[in-house]
C-alpha cells in the first residue's frame, strides 16, 4: 500500500477545491486599471472571453478583443491624474464580488467611457459606484458597473442642479 501517494492525491484534491480569494483578484484587477495602469495585466485577471458593461453610459466591451480595446482606448491610463477611489463596502460570494466605492477626480480631460464627447470642464467630481464582478474560478468573467449619470452630469455643469435635485 502506497500511503504517500494517497496523501499526495488528497493534498492535490484539497488544493483544487480551495476557494479563491476573489477580493484579492478584484483588488489586483482594479490596481491595473487605475493605480498601475497596464492593459495586459488587467486582461490576465479575466477569462478568455469576458465582458464589461458600464451601464449608465452603455460603454464597455464584449469578448477578449472588445474588452481589450475598451481598456486600451477608454479606461486604462485614461483617467485624470488626481483620480482617487474610496472603498465603502464589499460583499464576497462564492463566485461574485460586489463593491460600493466613491470615485473622485477633476474633469480635466475627456473621459470617453463616462462622458463620451464631453470636453473637460475642470469641475471636481465625487461619484458613488456599485461594481459587480462575476468570477469563473480565479478569473473575472464579467463586470457590471453602475453610477448615477444625472449626478455626474450635474457635477460637471451639464445638468441644472435645481432640476436634478
What label would you give each PLM region?
Residues 2-165:
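C-terminal and inter-domain tail/linker signature
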